[in-house]
Amino acid sequence: MKLAYLYKKMALTSLISAVIFSLISCKEQSANIGSQAPDLAVFNLQGQKIELQQFAGKKLLLNFWSETCGICIVELKQLQQLAEKYPDNLQILAINIDGERGDTQKSAVKNQLILPIVKDQLNITAERYQLVGTPTSFVLDPTGKILYKFEGLISESKLLALFKDP
């Protein structure tokens, strides 16, 4: 009886240690200009996991946003217009950071957003990218290296330059 209790206690301790270790290792990745972009821990609105390698070979803009951020919605609409005008030059991935408290699907419909939208449900991706506020965007080259980081609304001239420069 005592032996079974001891085994259960050891198993629980091992499980807790593994969870803590995996959470700590999640934070080890960081987003620095010139370095490889950290992995994503996001799911699309249909519940499918989305990974950076799905965008390999393409220039990609990761846009972190919140439903309660009016400027974020303005920027997403600008990104959407430019993505429609220049569909082959820059891929967009809109990463919602509201977690459980937000209804991202409802917000996308309300704001007529048709960009690829994903949820960072546990804010693991936001931590890996050292997010301070929204909107924040990262531009990755086709190999996944971070070229630029923008905190706040990106000016129209910078956005246009990003889309026009393949």
Describe the residue ranges of each PLM region.
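Short active-site neighborhood of thiol/selenol oxidoreductases, capturing the structured segment around
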Residues: L52-G70
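Hydrophobic beta-strand core positions in alpha/beta domains
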Residues: N63, A94, F138-V139
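Structural microenvironment flanking redox-active thiols in thiol-disulfide oxidoreductases
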Residues: I73-N111, Q121-E127
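Bacterial N-terminal signal peptides that target proteins for export
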Residues: K2-S14
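Thiol/disulfide oxidoreductase modules built on the thioredoxin-like
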Residues: S107-L113, Q121-K164
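Bacterial N-terminal signal peptides
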Residues: T13-S22
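N-terminal "domain-start" segment that seeds a small globular fold
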Residues: C26-L52
